């Protein structure tokens, strides 16, 4: 019974995490936020991200 109680919340969280990742990949806003995070972490990524955003506009 203890294993069943511990297993259910983990499976539920795993399902929510997988669902969140799928939505982040599909949603343009999710990609935009990833690009902004890369710009904040490393200035050298700004040029490549700017070209990628320009490519997304088409």
UniProtKB/Swiss-Prot annotation:
The precursor is cleaved by proteases to produce a number of active cholecystokinins. One of its GO terms (molecular function) is neuropeptide hormone activity. GO terms for biological process: digestion; response to food. Keywords: Amidation, Cleavage on pair of basic residues, Hormone, Secreted, Sulfation. Signal peptide: none annotated. This is Cholecystokinins. GO terms for cellular component: axon; extracellular space. Binds to CCK-A receptors in the pancreas and CCK-B receptors in the brain. cholecystokinin 8 binds CCK-A receptors more potently than cholecystokinin 58, cholecystokinin 8 and cholecystokinin 58 bind CCK-B receptors with equal affinity. The modification Phenylalanine amide is found at residue 58. It is found in: Secreted. Belongs to the gastrin/cholecystokinin family. The gene is CCK. This peptide hormone induces gall bladder contraction and the release of pancreatic enzymes in the gut. Its function in the brain is not clear. Binding to CCK-A receptors stimulates amylase release from the pancreas, binding to CCK-B receptors stimulates gastric acid secretion. cholecystokinin 58 and cholecystokinin 8, but not cholecystokinin 58 desnonopeptide, stimulate amylase release from the pancreas. cholecystokinin 58, but not cholecystokinin 8, increases bile-pancreatic volume. The modification Sulfotyrosine is found at residue 52. The keyword Secreted applies. The keyword Secreted applies. It comes from Canis lupus familiaris.
